[in-house]
Amino acid sequence: MESLQLFTRQTKAISTARRSLLVIESIPGIRYNEIVEVVLGTGESRIGQVIEVGKVTTVVQVFGGVSEVDLLSSKVKYKGETLKLPVSPDLLGRIFDGSGHPIDGGPPIVADDYHDINGIPANPASRMPPAEFIETGISAIDGLNVLVRGQKLPIFSGSGLPHNKIAAQILRQASLKGKTEEFAIVFAAIGVSYDDAGYFISNLEETGALSRAVGFINTASSPVIERLSTPRLALTAAEYLAWEQDMHVLVILTDITNYCDALRELAAMRGEIPSRRGYPGYMYTDLASLYERAGRISGREGSITIIPILTMPDDDITHPIADLTGYITEGQIVLSRALERKRIYPPIDVFLSLSRMMKEGIGEGNTREDHNNVFMQSYATYAEGNYLREISTVIGSEALSDRDRIYLDASDRFEQEFISQDEFYRRSVEETLETAWNIFSMLPVEDLKLIQEEYIKKYLPETSK
């Protein structure tokens, strides 16, 4: 009876077809986000999604556009359900498009179940705080802005900066210490070019990272509505792997700016009143519906950690996308154009970057006992060196003391040896800490005021004692 009813819930009362939207007559029982099938006069069919429900009219976003939709001969069939992702352990090692269809040449997924891409809200009382160190192999993150299991830590980038290279490097290198077999990566590329899509796919395949990863690739030429479904498909796959397969999942979403631009475009199509810089007023809520799917849940072995990557228009960190993301997430990694000009990779600005959950993932039992002291002394040393560099441009380097020159050299070494590393080199957290100690060995021992004496005796190279 239910399948028969699905075929009777249809209409030919299409009043408007504009860009990728259809405005049709409302019928009883229509739900927001419901999937529809648009059947053209030629017999060809396209999938759409209900994005607005009114008493008189309903607005449908059509995947693939409405250029061939004839108002008289086309009809809309309602499916009675929302967009769902087929899930099974076979998701690992596969690559899909922004609608959930395989694009890697493999067969369709034989589903154990179908999960709504909008997710199921977790009981707030069952949520556990982020904890436990995730090693990315990048010193500027592992040493100074630690990523913790269950955290949401965005990367703020700019046009032309190497955020794609950093995303690919994290894809290859990230792991949970001692639990490699339980660790998985879910990657979503939103509105990327064909070149970028090819880069991510080849990177996953050539490095072997694909065996523990699931990829969702949405290209810039795909329908706008797919920009909105792509991260939700990725997070649905992550929830399945985390909550049903007991895996620790790291989700990388790039580029959130393309996602928000799609929100703005759809809002403009629907004639909504814009908010800041033309973005819809509900963008904060919409972004929160993505980011808040990260976390740890009591009684579940798995976890979801999210790294959203966004490009800030005009490098403006006060832009609404970066601003709202900063309110929801627990810190940020900021890329620096100044460091990029110095050919330092990854160009992470450690002064603007912050991980609010860092102290939950460092120290004995997670990284090493001296990590917090090394973290504080690294910032102090680099900050003083940067200050002296600015002063020397005014008063001249000749006016600097011998001690000042030591700090200038230490600051340069910090950029060249600690922050900078090859994109294919995975630096362990132990190596990261040792690199910092080697830089500290340049300084007078009495200047290491932020490090406990027992750690100085234990870790400082003998030549400087």
Regions found by a protein language model. Give the residues of each.
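P-loop NTPase nucleotide-binding/switch module
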Residues: S74-V76, L83, D90, P102-Q151, ...
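Active-site phosphate-binding and catalytic loops of NTP-dependent enzymes
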Residues: E2, E44-G48, L83-V87, H101-P108, ...
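P-loop NTPase catalytic core
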Residues: G143-S464
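N-terminal accessory targeting/assembly segments
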Residues: M1-R94, S99
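Generic beta-structure capping elements
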Residues: G41, V53, F63, G98, ...
